[in-house]
Amino acid sequence: MNSGRSLPSAITLTMIFEASALNRDEKIGGNIPSIKKLTRFGSKTYSYLSKVAMRHYLFETLNKLYGDDWKPAGCVESGSGDNKVVQFDITKQNILTHAELDAFGYMYTIGGQQGISRKGCVGITKAIALETWEGDMQFNANHDLARRPGTDPNPVNKEEHVSYY
């Protein structure tokens, strides 16, 4: 019997972890892959891992550790022209056959009709760096490959940030 106390409806997990900014944003100047960043408190820049990237890395880890229970759900391309979408194929799988659909939820659109959606029980938010990004860059060139045919190397720069998130 409940005796008047409310039961918890959710569990929240908050964690701090050290990582590199693993997801990239648009390229700057053609050959500089940038990290995802946001500006706060006037002019301080912080990198972040998007919730899409967090979901990706979490699912990939679960799939590697528990492959039989966390197999990837199949996807289909639906729609036509500029209205094409890639989505889970819920006509052939469901929350009982694929833990991914149960845990993270889904939205399934049907052209011209109301879509079907299921809110996942695992909610994920973006991970924002606890330390500011100070413009760190990695400079690379393919010297080894360019040397083989006797051509010039192609320089590539990329933004980097290691922080606690």
Map each language-model feature to its residues.
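RNA-binding basic/glycine-rich loop and surface signature characteristic of RAMP-family CRISPR effectors
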Residues: 1-165
